[in-house]
């Protein structure tokens, strides 16, 4: 009995040691893949390849196999700049930016929630992430959330992930599934410059909201469907030109022809264990210059 216990203990210890070594190895591989992803994006940006990276082409078209000693590893890129930045509705002091909150409501309404529901959720999100305790007309502050069966307080800070919206009053599972593909979490009080070359007609609400609802959704969808195979060129003015601009909407920085954020997804698999890392890489816009940098990373998996 004693020998059996010793054998079991040793076997368990060996397995744990092997698992820990495998986990450490895979985490090192994830770090190496991160450096490789940055290098690939930097080369693509400097070589002009990002101008032709559409939603399904160029850099975003193929999965890249990575060399590893055991198991398998892959890297895939996707545009991450066809989204509304939820954190843009507050400034650096945690105060609500009224114009951006209004645009957020316009977006939600255009996605299909309707004008009233869109405005209500925009109010609720603003109350959840701003620092004060003043309640927006259709919002909710701590006095609401602390009265729930499972009480909690508002974040009072920018969100790190769009998934945090599920905790907010009015954001049901069904509503979240509808709006999440249009949203992202980036820097406070900063709008994401939308990559027009990565848009599909389904994403017309982004342009609609960014331009304060100036042009009908159907016109925007029609223009997106006319995106040339090589993308809009020589610059974004070719995209805006058919609309005209009688209301004098400031179009500067609303959209561009290259991604300003790129998602890089690393998947490592070995001995029925896996590590998945999702990076958001910030790419300096146009002539801004500078190197791509990791804006955020999420590491997960079954190791």
Regions found by a protein language model. Name each.
Residues 1-303:
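Compositionally biased linear targeting/interaction segments
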